[in-house]
């Protein structure tokens, strides 16, 4: 596995902590959870989630939308995802958060 599993765990933990630090206290965000690089950002409703997903995709970030209420942004980057990529993703979510 050439260290990919440990790398995914390390970068995933970093990404979750940065998301919690930057947007975790937002009224639009209900929860941030996951394991490794599989992370879900639960939003207040599906409309807010759809808007955030569309804005992320317009910025070249591929994410999904899921959950029983369709209000979770699903992050599943490749195992080679780096800290720099995580920082870019967090910056984009911060910008989007300000517009929600």
Regions found by a protein language model. Give the residues of each.
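Conserved N-terminal phosphate-binding loop of PLP-dependent enzymes in the Aspartate aminotransferase
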Residues: 1-100
């Amino acid at each position: 596995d050439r260290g990919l599993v440990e790398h995914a765990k390390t970068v995933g933990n970093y990404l979750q902590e940065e998301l919690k630090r930057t947007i975790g206290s937002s009224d639009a965000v209900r929860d941030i959870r996951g394991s490794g690089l599989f992370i879900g950002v639960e939003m207040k409703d599906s409309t807010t989630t759809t808007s955030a997903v569309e804005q992320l995709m317009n910025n070249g970030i591929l994410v999904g939308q899921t959950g029983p209420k369709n209000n979770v942004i699903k992050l599943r980057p490749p195992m080679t995802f780096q800290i720099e990529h995580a920082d870019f993703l967090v910056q984009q979510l911060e910008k989007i958060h300000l517009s929600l």
